[in-house]
Structure formats: structure tokens, C-alpha cells
């Protein structure tokens, strides 16, 4: 694999957190952490591109229109979707920090 060197400026508080993870044995170096974080971010973006929340909502709305022959507890599904939505919002807040 061809590698390219880049320079990053990261707040000291984040560097301290990275260093703590290295001390705890999660990563062997800052480089390893940054490569991991970049791969994880690219994976998350790729997944979200494949199916956004809006696409999920469209699928749900279409299902509600076509559900005539399906016996299913709609209230239970809506509660589950509400839970997923709450978790999504929590996750997004964590990612923005």
C-alpha cells in the first residue's frame, strides 16, 4: 500500500485522550489511532450514504401504505423506530463533540 504523509493539528485535550488509550493498550501509537479513526469514519460515512434516515422513513411510509395483507403490530414497530431515532440522535451528538 502506498502511504502519504499528512500533518494534523489536533486540540491538546484530544491528544491527551489518545495518549491515554495508548497507555491502556488500545493502540500502539498515535499513528495507529489516527489510521483507525479515519477508517472508522470513512466506513460510517459509506454506510450512511447507502441508507440515510430519510430513506428509512420513506420505506416505512411506503410499508404503511401497502400493509393491507400483513398482520403486524404497528405500534410496536413505531416504538422501535422511535428508539432507533433517539439512539441515532445521541450517536450524532457524540460524533459532533
From Swiss-Prot:
GO biological process: regulation of DNA-templated transcription
CDD domains named among the record's database cross-references: RHH_NikR_HicB-like
Pfam families in the record: RHH_8
InterPro entries, per the entry: Arc_rbn_hlx_hlx (IPR013321), RHH_8 (IPR041088), Ribbon_hlx_hlx (IPR010985), Tscrpt_reg_CopG_prd (IPR016748)
Lineage of producing organism: Archaea, Methanobacteriati, Methanobacteriota, Methanomada group, Methanococci
Parts forming coiled coils: none
Protein's UniProt name: Uncharacterized protein MJ1679
Entries under Gene3D superfamilies matching the protein: Met repressor-like
Amino acid at each position: 500500500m502506498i502511504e502519504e504523509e499528512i500533518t494534523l493539528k489536533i486540540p491538546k485535550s484530544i491528544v491527551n485522550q489518545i495518549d491515554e488509550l495508548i497507555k491502556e493498550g488500545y493502540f500502539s501509537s498515535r499513528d495507529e489511532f489516527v489510521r483507525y479513526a479515519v477508517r472508522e469514519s470513512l466506513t460510517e460515512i459509506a454506510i450512511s450514504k447507502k441508507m440515510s434516515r430519510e430513506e428509512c422513513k420513506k420505506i416505512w411510509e411506503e410499508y404503511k401504505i401497502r400493509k393491507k395483507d400483513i398482520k403486524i403490530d404497528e405500534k410496536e414497530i413505531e416504538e422501535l423506530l422511535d428508539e432507533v431515532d433517539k439512539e441515532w440522535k445521541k450517536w450524532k451528538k457524540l460524533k459532533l463533540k
